[in-house]
Amino acid sequence: MKVMGSLKSAKSRDRDCKIVRRKGRVYVINKKKPRFKARQGY
């Protein structure tokens, strides 16, 4: 999982990427290609 300052580029890496909020953090998840997971936080 990548930790990024902004998820704009992470969301546009694949069509199946979705943004979710969990426990106050923002994540990009992708069920078909799990290598595209990312978390926002600094």
Swiss-Prot record:
InterPro entries: Ribosomal_bL36, Ribosomal_bL36_sp, Ribosomal_L36_bact. Belongs to the bacterial ribosomal protein bL36 family. The gene is rpmJ. NCBIfam families: PRK00831.1, rpmJ_bact. One of its GO terms (biological process) is translation. PANTHER family: 50S RIBOSOMAL PROTEIN L36 2 (PTHR47781), LARGE RIBOSOMAL SUBUNIT PROTEIN BL36B (PTHR47781:SF1). GO terms for molecular function: structural constituent of ribosome. It comes from the Bacteria. This is Large ribosomal subunit protein bL36. Keywords: Ribonucleoprotein, Ribosomal protein. GO terms for cellular component: ribonucleoprotein complex; ribosome.
